[in-house]
Amino acid sequence: MEKKDEGNPPMAVMGSRDENEDVKSTMRTAETMLRLVPVALCVSALVVMLKNTQTNDYGSLSYSDLGAFRYLVNANGICAGYSLLSAVIVAMPRAWTMPQAWTFFLLDQVLTYVILAAGTVSTEVLYLANKGDTSIAWSAACASFGGFCHKALISTVITFVAVIFYAALSLVSSYKLFSKYDAPVVTQSGEGIKTVTLGSPPPPPPPPPSNLHLHLHAKLACPAHNNSPN
C-alpha cells in the first residue's frame, strides 16, 4: 500500500505564501517609485518657473505677474509634497485598510485634476503670449520676451509629464480600492434573476421540507389509495 506523503501540502502552502509576499513586495516597490518620480518632476517645474524672470528694453516680466503661472507653482509644490508623503506611507510593509484605500483614491484623483488644471491654464497663457489676441488687447509678448516664454514652456511640459504619472497613480489606487470589494453575486430564483449588491453574502438556501409537508404531499399524490375501503 502506497504511503501518503503528508509533508507536501504544508510546504506548498508556505511556498504559496512566500510567492504572494514577493508579489506584494514588488508591487509596493513599483508603486513607491511611481510616487517618487512626480516629486522630481514637480520640483523641477516649480524651480524653472520660480526663476523665470526677464528684463530688457521693453520692461520686466516675471512669472508672478501672471496668475496662471502662480497657480502652476503652487500646484507643483502641493503635488511634490503629497507625492513624497504618499511614497513614504506606501513603502511601509503593512496591509491597507478600507479607509486608507479610500483616502488615497480620493487624494490621487484630486491631485491629478489639480496638476492637470495647472498645465492647462499655463498652456492657454503661453498660446496667447505667442499668438496674441487683438480682441482683448493681448499682444504677442513672446516676440519681446522670448527667454521668459521658453522657460515657461519647459515648466509647462514638465507639468504635463507629471500629469501622466498622476493618471497612472489614479488607476493604481482605483484598483487597490475596488479589488477589496466582492464581485456581484447573481442567483436564479423562481421569480427571475436576483442580483445581490457588492460585498453582500449570497442569499441562504430555502429550508428543507418538514415531515408534515412530506406526509401531506404523499397523501395528495395518492388520493385513490386514501379513499379505498378498509
UniProtKB/Swiss-Prot annotation:
Cytoplasmic topological domain: 1-29, 93-100, 173-230
Keywords: Cell membrane, Membrane, Transmembrane, Transmembrane helix
Subunit structure: Homodimer and heterodimers.
Family affiliation: Belongs to the Casparian strip membrane proteins (CASP) family.
tRNA processing among keywords: no
Source organism (scientific name): Populus trichocarpa
Extent of the signal sequence: none
Record-linked InterPro entries: CASP/CASPL, CASP_dom
Name of the protein: CASP-like protein 2A2
Topology, Extracellular side: 51-71, 122-151
Main location per the UniProt record: membrane
Membrane topology, as annotated: Multi-pass membrane protein
Entry's transmembrane regions: 30-50, 72-92, 101-121, 152-172
Positions of the UniProt region annotated as Disordered: 1-23
Subcellular localization, as worded in the UniProt entry: Cell membrane
GO cellular component: plasma membrane
One Pfam family here: CASP_dom
Keyword Transport included in the entry's annotation: no
